[in-house]
Amino acid sequence: MQCRKCCFACEKWCFIGAKAFLPLVVNFLIIWACWVHAWLVCWEPQLFESDTTFWRVYGVAGVAIGIMCNVLYLKVCKVGPGSPTDIDNFSVPLVEYQNACSAEGQHLTPPREMANSVCAKENGGLRFCTKCIGWKPDRSHHCSNYKRCVLKFDHYCPWFATAIGFHNHKYFVLFLWYVTILCFFCLGSTGFVFYNHILEIGAMRGPDGNTDYVGAISVNVMILMVLALVFAIAVGTFATFSLYLVFNNQSTVEFLESTQYRSAVPTAAYRYTFAPTSKTVGNVFDVGWKRNFQLVMGDKWWMWLLPIQPSEAARGNGTQFPLNKQVLQKIREAAAKEVQIRDQNQAYIKQQRQQQQKRTQYDLPQHLQPPPQEHYEYDDEAQDSGDDIPLINMVNKNNTK
C-alpha cells in the first residue's frame, strides 16, 4: 500500500515537473533556432560571397516566423480550450445534484441547448459529467489532466501543458504549421552552409590529403540542421494530420473512437438494434471540407494565416454545431426503424403470452381438471305432492338421460 502511494506521488511530481519544464524547452528551442538561423548563418558575411541581401532577407523572414510561433504558443496557453462549466446553466449546483441522486423519480433539468444534442452516452441518455457536475454538450469530453470538461476536446498536449479544444484549436494548428515552416527555413540555411563546407573541403584538400587549414563549421549550425530535419518530419506529419481533421471536422478523439448518436429508444430501454454511431451512419458534423475549414480557420483568407479567431456568431460557442442533413436523416431513419421493431416485437411477445395462457388452461392433466359443475333445479312433482322433502332436488345433468 505504501509503495502504491509512493508511485502515485512520484507520478504526480513528474507530471508537475514536465508541465513546468516542457513549455520552457519549446520556447528556448524556437528562440535558439532563430538566433542560429539569422545571426550565425544569414548575417555572417564570410559564409556567402554573393547574394548577401537575399540571405539577410531570408534570415529576417525566419525570425518573423519564429516570433509568430511564440505568439501562437502563448495564445494556445492563454486562451485555453474552453469548458462547458464556464457557460450558464451547464453547471449543476452540488445540492441540487445530491438531491436528484438521493430522491427517486427526481431528474435534473438540462439546459435548452441540450435539447438538440445528437450525441448520447452508453445508456442512451444525455451526457452528464459526474466529476465536473455539469452537462456535457456534443463533442465535449472530460480531460483528467486538465481536470475539467473541454468543449470539442481534441487532446491534451504536454508541450503546452494544456488541453486543445474549441477555443484554442486554430492557434494549435497554426503553431504546428509555422513550426514546420521555420524548420524548413533553418534546414535551408544550415544545409546550404554545410553543403558549401563540403565543397570547400574538396576544393582545398592538399596533395597529401591534409585539410587542417579548412575553416571548421559551427557546432550550433550542425545541431540546428539535425534538429530542423527531425522536427520538420515529425511536426510536419502531425500538422498534416491536424489539417486533415480540420477538413473532415473531426477531433482526434472522434477520429480514434466511435461517437454514439441519440435514438428514439435509448439503450437503457428494451432495444433490439445497436444505436447509430459515426462508424455506421457517418460523421454528422461533416458539412463539407470548405465549410469545415472556415468554421475553424475563419471565413476570410487573410484570417487563415493570422492568430485571429472567427466571431462567435460565425462559429458558435462550442455547445452546438452545424449538422450534415444527410447523416442526420440516416439517424432519424434508424430511430424510426428501431421504434417499429420495438413495437412489432412487443406485440409479438404479448400475443405469445396470451396463447401460452390459453394453452396452459386446456392442456392440464386429467387429475388436475376441475370437477363437473352441479346444477340445481326445482322438482315440480315433489312440490305438488306435499311430501316432506326438500323443494330443490340436486340433479346431475351428466347423469340424466
From Swiss-Prot:
- Segments on the Cytoplasmic face: 1-20, 78-171, 242-401
Record organism? Yarrowia lipolytica (strain CLIB 122 / E 150) (Yeast)
Q: Write the signal peptide boundaries.
A: none
Q: Single GO cellular component annotation?
A: Golgi apparatus
Question: Bias category Acidic residues: which stretches?
Answer: 377-387
Query: Which Pfam families does the record cross-reference, listed alphabetically?
Result: DHHC
Question: Mind telling me which PROSITE patterns this protein's record contains?
Answer: DHHC
Name of the featured protein:
Palmitoyltransferase PFA3
Task: Look at the named UniProt entry and state the broad enzyme category this protein falls under.
Answer: transferase
